[in-house]
């Protein structure tokens, strides 16, 4: 399936969105992945957009990378390779949002690379069913579906085939 590509240039910034729908033939689980690249120049950091972007999607798994590229100069001409404080991407995400997820950081401070992965803690099965009320399903079926969902999420989150 081919789609359209749209790139918008916003003055000194840009946002690019890539979508990846896919379907597993054995488990009947469908996933929809969205990659969003946000780049800014100047005083506005893309980190300030995280709460808005996370709130705009109903995401079960979130993977975020933040990289500081290049440098700027202070008023005396000294190069600044990091012009703001950061130890974790999580520092820029609302506490209420973080409470809904398990979050892990993998950062390379020397290279100004920051990586955070988040996995939803609670699964509301009704959100994953189409044209079916969760209570129409027998308890064992609900449990089996929830188990399949959780296994799929853990594999996507970890980036490896576990089950």
Question: Regions from the language model: what does each represent?
Answer:
Residues 1-163:
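Polybasic/polar functional segments that serve as interface/processing modules
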């Amino acid at each position: 399936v081919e789609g359209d590509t749209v790139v918008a240039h916003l003055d000194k910034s840009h946002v690019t969105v890539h979508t990846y729908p896919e379907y597993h033939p054995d488990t009947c689980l469908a996933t929809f992945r969205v990659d969003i690249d946000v780049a800014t120049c100047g005083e506005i950091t893309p980190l300030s957009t995280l709460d808005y972007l996370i709130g705009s999607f109903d995401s079960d798994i979130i993977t975020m990378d933040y990289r500081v590229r290049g440098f700027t100069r202070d008023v005396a001409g000294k190069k600044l390779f990091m012009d703001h404080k950061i130890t974790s991407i999580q520092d820029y995400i609302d506490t209420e949002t973080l409470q809904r997820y398990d979050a892990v950081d993998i950062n390379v401070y020397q290279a100004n690379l920051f990586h955070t992965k988040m996995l939803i803690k609670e699964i509301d099965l009704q959100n994953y069913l189409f044209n079916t009320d969760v209570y129409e399903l027998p308890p064992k079926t609900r449990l089996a579906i929830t188990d399949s969902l959780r296994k799929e999420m853990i594999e996507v989150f970890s980036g490896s085939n576990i089950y």
